[in-house]
Amino acid sequence: MDFRRIILWLVAIICFQATAFGQHKFVDRSTDVLCLAPAATGLVKALVEKDRKGVLQLTLSTATGIAVNYGLNACIKKNRPEMPNQPSWSDRHAFPSTHSMAAFDGATFLMRRYGWKWGVPAYAVSCYVAWGRVHANKHDWWDVLGGAAIGAGAALIYTRPFAKKVDLTISPAVFGEQGGGVHIAMQF
């Protein structure tokens, strides 16, 4: 009877470890894909709206974020938590997180350009990406916070709110002997 319990516990522990390893790998791979989702959503939204300025703003913010991110990666050369003894010449630098930069750049673009209904889900995905990079032992919290700050900052610099076309009419108004004025009408 005791032998069966030992076997049962060993099987349970092995299954738990296999599940944990599988989950770890799933989180790692899912963050590789989802880090691009907010920016891809922003690009599709801008193209559907025929928002050329939005496409340009997203392109500029992403290019700036990438340039700053890789520049800091080359200067700082902080090793990843998964490989602390990696040589300093390695291209596997941790700070700042490129995944977090890309995710938060896209999320901030969506929030600022198209409002909270687009931004909140994008920020939820971005937070998952940041958490996932730490969970997968690719980065620590400083790395993902640095990447998030770079991405959000780049998007804040370039992105302006999207305004639908409005009709604005300005015309002089004459009120007889009482004087005149300006008549302004706007149609949304």
What residues fall within each predicted segment?
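Interfacial segments of alpha-helical transmembrane regions
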Residues: 45-65
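N-terminal signal-anchor/start-transfer transmembrane helix
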Residues: 38-45
